[in-house]
UniProtKB/Swiss-Prot annotation:
Disulfide bonds: none annotated. The keyword ATP-binding applies. Gene3D superfamilies: 1.10.8.60, Nucleic acid-binding proteins, P-loop containing nucleotide triphosphate hydrolases. This is 26S proteasome regulatory subunit 6A homolog.
């Protein structure tokens, strides 16, 4: 009777479900074998259930430890950190290990040198000697990498506002503009043209000439045309009181230029640090010479096809050290003479184009009457003419205003200019 009931119950199930629920081998077993099989499955289920529970407990324990470690990490990574420099990275086999691992030696700002067998939470492969890192003040493990440090005086040399000067703002310097474009602008904007010919562009340019002839103005216009970072260094700024301070400024300036590239470094008044070397027992003279040697080293330290160009300006090329002028450093020398008559007329027109000028102003005659004027003095003529027109209550500048302006500037102009190193 029981067999009939079982068969009836089995026939009421779908064929696929019946095969999934009861394997064929079960029907070939005796009742004792079925009971024994059921007990084995029940024991196996209990074992799996206990393993499942233990795994859950183990997972909860791991999650708890992860949370505790994250909390500790968050506490330990809170500022402030100690600042340290990476001194050395060592590959060595630690106790209990078979494979070599990377260890780090750091020098903290507290003047301690620390060996870290386990560096910390940063990627050691990305660390380099000299890198700046933040370390925990208690365990000294490395928590973060810091950006490179530059002298604050060097950062102040970077001109944040992009130069707005254009070549059209410069008069009488067409040849000089062409030479500067070939030496500085083209290598930065059309590098492939030099590569196709197979020549290397010059590293730097030396502009020399009397004051007020447009050297700084042309350097700013050049930086504006290349859309590059513009670092302006003055020679007297690099002469510092402490030994090695000026050389560090030069070193940091070139390091900042490499990071911010493409960059134009403009060194004004180069004769302040670039004078010919001589024997001296005065420590100040030796420090100036050390600064110049660092400048020579930095000029040799980057290739001519790098995105760094050096433009130097001086009034006294005759007192510069020959090592600065040799090929491979400041290759191109561009002279800025006093403007001729045609150039003076062009400069006067440029500086007066935004003024309300009468049509009877003869710039050619003004150019003839302003012989030996430089560009800055010609600009002063236009300013003086405007002040004279204001003084007489006029609304536009007439020719006589410019003539009186020339007389005013001529009266202030020194007859002889002497420069001392």
């Amino acid at each position: 009777m029981s067999n009939k009931r079982t068969t009836t119950k089995d026939e009421s199930l779908p064929q696929a479900e019946k095969e999934a629920v009861i394997p064929d081998e079960i029907f070939q077993m005796t009742a004792d074998e079925v009971n024994r099989k059921a007990k084995l499955l029940e024991n196996e289920t209990k074992v799996l259930r206990s393993e499942h529970i233990s795994k859950h407990l183990e997972m909860d324990s791991i999650q708890k430890r992860i949370k505790e470690n994250n909390d500790k990490l968050q506490v330990n990574t809170q500022l402030p950190h100690l600042v340290a420099n990476v001194v050395e990275i060592i590959d060595m086999v630690l106790d209990g290990e078979t494979q070599p691992s990377k260890c780090v030696v750091v020098k903290a700002s507290t003047r301690q040198t620390i060996f870290l067998a386990y560096p910390g939470i940063v990627d050691v492969d990305k660390l380099r000697p000299g890198d700046l890192v933040g370390i925990n003040k208690d365990s000294y493990i490395i928590l973060d990498t810091l950006p490179p440090e530059y002298d604050s005086r060097v950062k102040a040399m970077e001109i944040d506002e992009k130069p707005t000067e254009e070549y059209s703002d410069i008069g009488g310097l067409d040849k000089q503009i062409q030479e500067l474009v070939e030496a500085v602008v083209l290598p930065m904007t059309h590098k492939e043209r030099f590569e196709s010919i197979g020549i290397k562009p010059p590293k730097g340019v030396l502009m020399y000439g009397p004051p007020g002839t447009g050297k700084t103005l042309l350097a700013r216009a050049c930086a504006a045309q290349t859309n590059s970072t513009y670092l302006k260094l003055a020679g007297p700024q690099l002469v510092q009181m402490f030994i090695g301070d000026g050389a560090k400024l030069v070193r940091d300036a070139f390091a900042l230029a490499k990071e911010k590239g493409p960059t134009i470094i403009f060194i004004d008044e180069l004769d302040a640090i670039g004078t010919k070397r001589f024997d001296s027992e005065v420590s100040g003279d030796r420090e100036v010479q050390r600064t110049m040697l660092e400048l020579l080293n930095q000029l040799d330290g980057f290739s001519s096809d790098a995105n760094i160009k050096v433009i130097a300006a001086t009034n006294r090329i005759d007192i510069l050290d020959p090592a600065l002028l040799r090929s491979g450093r400041l290759d191109r020398k561009i002279e800025f003479p006093l403007p001729n008559e045609e150039a003076r007329a062009h400069i006067l027109q440029i500086h007066s184009r935004k003024m309300n000028v009468s049509a009877d102003v003869n710039f050619d005659e003004l150019a003839r009457s302003s012989e030996d004027f430089n560009g800055a003095q010609l600009k002063a003529v236009c300013v003086e003419a405007g002040m004279i027109a204001l003084r007489r209550g006029g609304t536009e500048l007439i020719h006589n205003d410019f003539v009186e302006g020339c007389v005013e500037v001529m009266a202030k102009k020194k007859k002889t200019l002497e420069y001392y190193a």
